[in-house]
C-alpha cells in the first residue's frame, strides 16, 4: 500500500492547479460518485474540461510525483474505503458532450452518461446502439471494457477512439486496438486516458427503435436487483459450454454453489440475481471483497471453473 500524500505535497499541488486554472475539489467522498455507494474520502479530485488541461495535469502529476487514478461514472467499480494515497482525475466540461457529424456518425465525449446519451441518439432515428441505453456509467468506461449486452458490443459501432497515452494524443481505429469480450488493451494501460469516440449507425424506423429500447429496458429491469446499490455483474461469463452447446452463465455457477443470498457485513450476494453483490446500506469495500473471494473459491471447488471479475477495483482493497 502506498503512503498517504503529505500535506505539503498536496498544498503545493493544489496551488499549481489554481495557478493553471484547472478545476478541482478537495476532500471528496468517492462513494457518492459510484453506483455501489461505497468508497472513502479522496484528498483531491481534478476535473479538466478540455484536452489541453488533461495534458497539463499529467505534467503536473509528474512534476509533483503525485500518484493518480482516473474515475468515470463509477458504475462497474469497487472503490477503496481509504483512497487517500492518490489523486483522482475525472473528466468534465466538453467531455460530457456528444454531437452529430451527419450521416449516422456521432462524436461522443468520454464523460457522457451512456444511458441517456445512447437513448437520445437512438431516438434521433438511428439504430444499432439501443443496447447501450441499458448500460449505466460513462462512455469512457464503456470503451475500456468494451461494454455490451443482448448480443451487442460497443466496439461493433466504433469508428475511432481518441485517447492520451503518456501525454501523447492518439486517434485509432478498432483494427489498431486489441479488444474482445469485456476487454480492451486500455484495461492494462493505466497511463491511457480515453477522451472520446466516433461511432457510425444506420438509419432505422423510429417505431421499431422505440420498441427495441423498451424491450431492452424491460429485460434489464426484470433480470437485475431493483432499486439496489450495486456495480452490475460482478463476474464475467466463463466461456464454458455444456454438451448441448449452451453457454454456462456465471450466475448459474454461483447458484449451484449455494451462494445466493450470502451476507458479509453490509454486503449481500443478491437473492434476485446472484451475479450481483448489493450494498444493503452499510457495506464497505472489504465486505464486498470478502464475498468476491468467497465466490471464486466456492465456485472453483464445486465446478472446477475459475471465475474472473468483471468489476474493477479502484485503490487498495484489503
Curated annotation (Swiss-Prot):
Keyword RNA-binding carried by entry: no
Cofactor(s) essential for the protein: FAD
Subcellular location: Cytoplasm
Origin superkingdom: Bacteria
Span of domain FAD-binding PCMH-type: 38-204
PROSITE patterns: FAD_PCMH
Region (Disordered): 212-232
Keyword tags: Cell cycle, Cell division, Cell shape, Cell wall biogenesis/degradation, Cytoplasm, FAD, Flavoprotein, NADP, Oxidoreductase, Peptidoglycan synthesis
Enzyme Commission identifier(s): 1.3.1.98
Active site (catalytic residues): 182, 233 (proton donor), 310
Pathway(s): Cell wall biogenesis; peptidoglycan biosynthesis
GO CC annotation, single: cytosol
GO BP term, pick one: peptidoglycan biosynthetic process
Record field: catalytic activity: UDP-N-acetyl-alpha-D-muramate + NADP(+) = UDP-N-acetyl-3-O-(1-carboxyvinyl)-alpha-D-glucosamine + NADPH + H(+)
Comp. bias regions, Basic and acidic residues: 212-229
GO molecular function list: FAD binding; flavin adenine dinucleotide binding; UDP-N-acetylmuramate dehydrogenase activity
Pfam families in UniProt: FAD_binding_4, MurB_C
Family: Belongs to the MurB family.
HAMAP family assigned: MurB
Described purpose of this protein according to its UniProt entry: Cell wall formation.
NCBIfam families: murB, PRK13905.1
Name under which the protein is recorded: UDP-N-acetylenolpyruvoylglucosamine reductase
Amino acid at each position: 500500500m502506498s503512503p498517504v500524500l503529505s500535506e505539503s505535497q498536496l498544498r503545493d499541488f493544489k496551488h499549481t492547479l489554481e495557478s493553471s486554472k484547472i478545476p478541482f475539489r478537495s476532500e471528496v467522498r468517492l462513494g457518492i460518485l459510484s453506483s455501489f455507494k461505497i468508497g472513502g474520502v479522496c484528498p483531491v479530485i481534478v476535473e479538466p474540461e478540455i484536452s489541453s488541461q488533461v495534458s497539463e495535469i499529467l505534467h503536473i502529476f509528474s512534476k509533483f510525483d503525485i500518484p493518480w487514478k482516473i474515475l468515470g461514472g463509477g458504475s462497474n467499480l469497487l472503490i477503496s474505503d481509504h483512497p487517500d494515497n492518490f489523486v483522482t482525475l475525472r473528466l468534465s466540461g466538453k467531455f460530457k458532450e456528444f454531437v452529430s457529424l451527419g450521416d449516422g456518425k456521432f462524436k461522443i465525449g468520454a464523460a457522457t452518461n451512456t444511458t441517456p446519451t445512447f437513448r437520445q441518439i437512438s431516438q434521433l432515428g438511428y439504430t444499432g446502439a439501443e443496447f447501450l441505453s441499458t448500460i449505466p456509467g460513462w462512455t469512457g468506461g464503456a470503451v475500456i471494457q468494451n461494454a455490451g449486452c443482448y448480443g451487442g458490443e460497443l466496439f461493433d459501432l466504433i469508428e475511432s477512439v481518441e485517447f492520451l497515452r503518456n501525454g501523447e494524443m492518439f486517434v485509432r481505429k478498432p483494427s489498431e486496438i486489441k479488444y474482445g469480450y469485456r476487454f480492451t488493451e486500455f484495461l492494462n494501460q493505466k497511463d491511457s486516458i480515453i477522451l472520446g469516440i466516433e461511432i457510425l449507425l444506420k438509419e432505422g424506423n423510429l417505431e421499431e427503435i422505440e420498441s427495441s429500447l423498451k424491450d431492452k429496458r424491460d429485460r434489464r429491469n426484470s433480470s437485475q436487483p431493483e432499486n439496489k446499490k450495486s456495480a452490475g455483474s460482478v463476474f464475467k461469463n466463463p466461456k464454458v459450454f455444456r454438451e448441448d452447446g449452451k453457454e454456462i452463465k456465471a450466475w448459474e455457477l454461483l447458484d449451484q454453489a449455494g451462494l445466493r443470498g450470502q451476507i458479509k457485513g453490509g454486503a449481500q450476494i443478491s437473492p434476485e440475481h446472484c451475479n450481483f453483490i448489493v450494498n444493503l446500506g452499510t457495506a464497505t469495500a472489504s465486505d464486498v471483497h470478502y464475498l468476491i473471494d468467497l465466490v471464486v473459491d466456492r465456485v472453483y471447488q464445486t465446478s472446477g471453473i475459475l471465475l474472473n471479475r468483471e468489476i474493477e477495483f479502484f485503490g487498495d482493497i484489503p
